[in-house]
């Protein structure tokens, strides 16, 4: 894995040396149970599954060798369990982001992928959209019939785009988090970024960096752009600086982000190097 040296800082150390989980022909029942647990964890975004929610019939078919891991993943993604967790209560752009993450192990590369799957869903329905991921050449090349899907966005692989590395960190927020427990809720994480065809800065998941994980403010009082300088600041380039309250070891109930515009970034550092605030981003305007 190319990020091994920074794995602990980025919250990916759990995947640094982990080999793909595969269902082999000579696997015993205990190993099959581990495969099933890995499928639930990946496809359901690490969300907790009650004993009563488990798909016992599907598990039995896999245990008896009647279906492959690929077919288990397909049926799980089409199940009412998956729909209730990720389809019914989310915007469709968020649904597509999660389908890419859960089924292909990566983030969407560009807006055309979102548009394609939205059109497929509207014209042929939900199940056809799920089939398009599972039956794709990308899925077959990486997971074949019996490898449990895993996060490929942390690796450099043939055919992958570099932008996928930064975007996967918008979707993956730590090994112990689930896709239904994140602060932004049901809103899409990559909609604005894909529309601008831009790449975001890698934001380490919560739990790393002593608990500090910066998330950009959805709304702010300071402007996001400036045109042809500003008379209030005089000539020269402006910078939008956003600072955030540093998380302490104790539980934080509320986080506060503040934005301000500076003509020179050096003006900010003497006043912001206190124990209460940490510079989260510096953006040229």
Swiss-Prot record:
One of its GO terms (cellular component) is plasma membrane-derived thylakoid membrane. It is found in: Cellular thylakoid membrane. Its main location: membrane. GO terms for biological process: photosynthesis. Residues 1-180 form the PBS-linker domain. Keywords: Antenna complex, Membrane, Photosynthesis, Phycobilisome, Thylakoid. InterPro entries: PBS_linker_dom, PBS_linker_sf, Phycobilisome. It is a peripheral membrane protein. PROSITE patterns: PBS_LINKER. Rod linker protein, associated with phycocyanin. Linker polypeptides determine the state of aggregation and the location of the disk-shaped phycobiliprotein units within the phycobilisome and modulate their spectroscopic properties in order to mediate a directed and optimal energy transfer. PANTHER family: PHYCOBILIPROTEIN APCE, PHYCOBILISOME 32.1 KDA LINKER POLYPEPTIDE, PHYCOCYANIN-ASSOCIATED, ROD 2-RELATED. Belongs to the phycobilisome linker protein family. This is Phycobilisome 31.6 kDa linker polypeptide, phycocyanin-associated, rod. It comes from Microchaete diplosiphon.
């Amino acid at each position: 894995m190319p990020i091994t040296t920074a794995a602990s800082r980025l919250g990916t150390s759990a995947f640094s040396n982990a080999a793909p989980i595969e269902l082999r022909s000579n696997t015993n029942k205990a190993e099959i149970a581990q495969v099933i647990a890995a499928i639930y964890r990946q496809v359901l975004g690490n969300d907790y599954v009650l004993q009563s929610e488990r798909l016992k019939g599907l598990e039995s078919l896999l245990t008896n060798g009647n279906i492959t891991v690929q077919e288990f993943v397909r049926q799980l993604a089409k199940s009412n369990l998956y729909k209730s967790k990720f389809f019914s209560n989310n915007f469709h752009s968020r649904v597509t982001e999660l389908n890419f993450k859960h089924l292909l192990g990566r983030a969407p590369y560009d807006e055309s992928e979102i548009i394609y799957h939205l059109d497929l869903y509207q014209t042929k329905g939900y199940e056809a959209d799920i089939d398009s991921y599972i039956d794709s050449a990308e899925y077959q090349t990486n997971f074949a019939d019996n490898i449990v899907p895993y996060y490929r966005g942390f690796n450099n692989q043939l055919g992958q785009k570099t932008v996928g590395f930064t975007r996967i960190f918008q979707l993956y927020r730590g090994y112990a988090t689930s896709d239904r427990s994140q602060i932004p809720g049901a809103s899409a994480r990559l909609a604005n970024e894909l529309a601008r065809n831009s790449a975001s800065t890698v934001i380490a998941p919560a739990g790393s960096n002593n608990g500090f994980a910066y998330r950009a403010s959805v709304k702010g009082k300071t402007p996001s752009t400036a045109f042809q300088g500003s008379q209030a600041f005089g000539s020269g380039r402006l910078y939008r600086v956003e600072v955030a309250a540093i998380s302490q070891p104790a539980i934080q109930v509320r986080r506060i982000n503040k934005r301000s515009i500076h003509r020179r970034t050096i003006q900010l550092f003497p006043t912001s190097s206190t124990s209460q605030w940490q510079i989260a981003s510096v953006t040229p305007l």
